[in-house]
């Protein structure tokens, strides 16, 4: 099913954008892993899907559980192996995280998890504070986390934009990093502070990759929606 969808979507994406993939040697050619990218446009999942397609990996995504209840669309999500996520108090949790993680590992799949959980609230599109879904999945399944950053999707579709900019073709750069070292968190019981510390390592890696792509330095303090009276899910501003 995924290959059928890709056959329809990939040509369209190639028409509107040029994809420049960097450090692809960091993406495992086989075996399961979590791909953890930054997130600032609704079109990001398509961009990362095309990137994985180019690398001959068929990605899965963690999707809001409510989407699986939509007629036809929900069936499509299930048919393509997407993983439902329950959202509660601003925290993303797989409906059965251990079972989902084990299935991903058993299948040898690549799963895309946005650690921020939603579009960044940072006004300059830097990664904001992350949630623990990516590291929980990776640690429970004992698989690596591959950080990634992209820049250029905001030219295709601005944050909360309503129309895709079709012309001229946009350049999108995607940079993949080496696996995040989570060895300090493996093989032992973990509490909330451990997951938070592991998540910070992932967010540091993503931010560093984005700094490289942008040729800029990110703010010293990562954006935290709770300190700016912003919601952590859904829209936080009008387009």
Residue ranges and their predicted role:
Residues 123-192, 223-225, 236-237:
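A cross-family acyltransferase "interaction/gating" segment
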Residues 51, 76, 103, 134-140:
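Hydrophobic/aromatic ligand-binding patch that stacks against planar heteroaromatic rings
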Residues 28-92:
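Catalytic core of membrane glycerolipid acyltransferases/transacylases, capturing the structured
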Residues 98-103, 170-212:
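A charged, well-structured terminal subsegment
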Residues 103-134:
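Catalytic-site beta-strand/loop segments enriched in glycine and acidic/polar residues
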Residues 1-29, 71-80:
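A transmembrane-helix-recognition feature enriched in membrane-embedded lipid enzymes
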């Amino acid at each position: 099913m995924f290959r059928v969808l890709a056959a329809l979507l990939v040509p369209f994406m190639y028409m509107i954008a040029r994809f420049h993939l960097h450090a692809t040697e960091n993406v495992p050619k086989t075996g399961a892993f979590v791909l953890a990218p930054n997130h600032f446009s609704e079109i990001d999942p398509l961009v990362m899907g095309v990137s994985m397609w180019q690398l001959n990996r068929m990605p899965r995504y963690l999707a809001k559980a409510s989407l699986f209840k939509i007629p036809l669309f929900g069936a499509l999500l299930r048919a393509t192996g997407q993983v439902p996520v329950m959202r509660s108090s601003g925290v993303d949790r797989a409906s059965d995280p251990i079972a989902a993680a084990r299935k991903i590992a058993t299948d040898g799949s690549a799963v895309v998890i946005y650690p921020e959980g939603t579009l960044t609230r940072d006004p300059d599109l830097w990664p904001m504070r992350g949630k623990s879904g990516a590291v929980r999945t990776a640690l429970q399944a004992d698989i690596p986390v591959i950080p990634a950053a992209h820049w250029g999707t905001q030219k295709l579709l601005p944050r909360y934009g309503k129309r895709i900019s079709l012309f001229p073709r946009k350049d999108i750069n995607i940079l993949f990093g080496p696996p995040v070292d989570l060895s300090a968190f493996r093989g032992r019981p973990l509490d909330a502070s451990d997951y938070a510390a592991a998540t910070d390592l992932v967010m540091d890696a993503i931010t560093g990759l984005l700094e490289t792509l942008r040729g800029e330095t990110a703010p010293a303090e990562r954006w935290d929606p709770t300190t700016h009276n912003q919601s952590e899910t859904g829209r936080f501003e009008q387009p």
